[in-house]
Amino acid sequence: MSAKDVKFHDSARARIVKGVNVLADAVKVTLGPKGRNVVIERSFGAPTITKDGVSVAKEIELKDRFENMGAQIVKQVASKTADVAGDGTTTATVLAQAIVQEGMKHVAAGMNPMDLKRGIDKAVAAVLDELRKLSKPISTNREIAQVGSISANADEAIGKIIADAMEKVGKEGVITVEDGKSLENELDVVEGMQFDRGYVSPYFINDPEKQAAYLDDALILLHDKKISNIRDLLPVLEATSKAGKPLLIVAEDIDGEALATLVVNAMRGILKVAAVKAPGFGDRRKAMLEDIAILTGATVISEETGKQLQKASLEDLGSAKRVEVRKEDTIIIDGAGDQERIEARVKSIRTQIDETTSDYDREKLQERVAKLAGGVAVIKVGAATEVEMKEKKDRVDDALHATRAAVEEGIVPGGGVALLRARSTATSLKGANSDQDAGIQIVLRALEAPLRVIASNAGDEPSVVIAKVLEGKGNFGYNAATGEYGDLVEAGVVDPTKVTRTALQNAASIAGLILTTDATVADAPKDEKPAQAPAPELEY
């Protein structure tokens, strides 16, 4: 085990705060409509240019081990906020830095860090309650576009394309972001169910130009086990051949003799067939097979249902107007399932969404609802260069998460104004002692930080801007894009409540941990001696 370097008290905290400041200062230049770019070096290829706070935070590693601890702790604020809300990473980092800086002054003055933390937590809880009261739900296409535009750094084209996508596939629909082939952003809507499994063998391709297998008016066989023996498949193959229809086989896996026979018949044109692996794993795979069965009117051939592959008939097969099978995915369009059964299935999955406590499970269940109820929208991001494409794609991802968050919990006035207005309830709060009162005051001052940074990045004097905003009420605030004051909601400067709430919660949580730190432990630097120079060669 290597030797450790240990620091205590003020010495430990000072180095951590230095790391916090380095990371936060690099991230906060991106905040607001007039935020600046950050250029990040890449070991290979061109550097990345970004205005995305979390992308900047993820790249920062400091040489000093103790300072790096501070940077990595604050990096967690950005990452956690991005995971939960998808945006607000820069705001969260700015708030964390402000709480840490204010708090350290009080700790240095001899106040009890634990009481300061209790005061901070008390003030944050009051502010969060007020934020929920300020929040208003969004419903119109225009409001959704406004949220998307703000999150994409005032890019109205991105806001509009996200609003159009949500209108077409529903607010719970699946919206994916891909690299485009042109200079303009494009929106493609895929009707039907798409899942991320492609053909088992490229020999099933019947359109070499598009590298895909297209099956029109196809029958669909669903099996939850591996198919290796061709004898098991023969009854189904003979029945579909007589019916003169193409066949899609979805199974756990298809290999050996069964795959070889299908490939040979497909290549000779005797059978129009394609085989894909079933999507998902374990219980999720069973559920998704059942979804496909309900969508297409099929029965899953499974031991649990008492069905055997050898005895399967045409009645057990589903059908769809068109099936598209590519290398990475399969799309089933216009399945022949019963509409009432599909609606009942969607209702059942929505109940599971309400009951689940896991964010991952919730996301997967929402995807299943979207695939059954709507379609899949694909936003293709257009740009002139690869560097611009990556930067733009990051902004579209941010905007997409922000609009979903806004639909979920509503919106509040943007530009840092919501936090200023929400602190009104905390001004009258009292702690159990003077140290807790100081903790409450730390939060009240820190809530000004996002607006200060937005104003500073726009080239205005922060103190003047804050004084002017505090003179007004409600949605009145500073629009950094135009440099004017007015009703921010009316001007379309709004933030999702979930983003603002998550940013404050995570910032206060991490800042509280830093303030209550009293020792730090890191690997001691190794004393590596320089390599010995080789002996000179003797000349003869």
From Swiss-Prot:
HAMAP family according to UniProt: CH60
Family the entry assigns: Belongs to the chaperonin (HSP60) family.
The protein's role, per its UniProt record: Together with its co-chaperonin GroES, plays an essential role in assisting protein folding. The GroEL-GroES system forms a nano-cage that allows encapsulation of the non-native substrate proteins and provides a physical environment optimized to promote and accelerate protein folding.
Subunit structure of this chain's protein: Forms a cylinder of 14 subunits composed of two heptameric rings stacked back-to-back. Interacts with the co-chaperonin GroES.
GO cellular component, one term: cytoplasm
InterPro entries the UniProt entry points to: Chaperonin_Cpn60_CS, Cpn60/GroEL, Cpn60/GroEL/TCP-1, GroEL-like_apical_dom_sf, GROEL-like_equatorial_sf, TCP-1-like_intermed_sf
Catalytic activity line of the entry: ATP + H2O + a folded polypeptide = ADP + phosphate + an unfolded polypeptide
UniProtKB keywords: ATP-binding, Chaperone, Cytoplasm, Isomerase, Nucleotide-binding
Chain sites annotated for binding ATP: 30-33, 51, 87-91, 415, 479-481, 495
Highest taxon of the lineage: Bacteria
Taxonomic lineage: Bacteria, Pseudomonadati, Pseudomonadota, Betaproteobacteria, Burkholderiales
Organism: Burkholderia ambifaria (strain ATCC BAA-244 / DSM 16087 / CCUG 44356 / LMG 19182 / AMMD) (Burkholderia cepacia (strain AMMD))
Name of this chain's protein: Chaperonin GroEL 3
GO molecular function: ATP binding; ATP-dependent protein folding chaperone; isomerase activity; unfolded protein binding
EC code: 5.6.1.7
Keyword Lipid biosynthesis: no
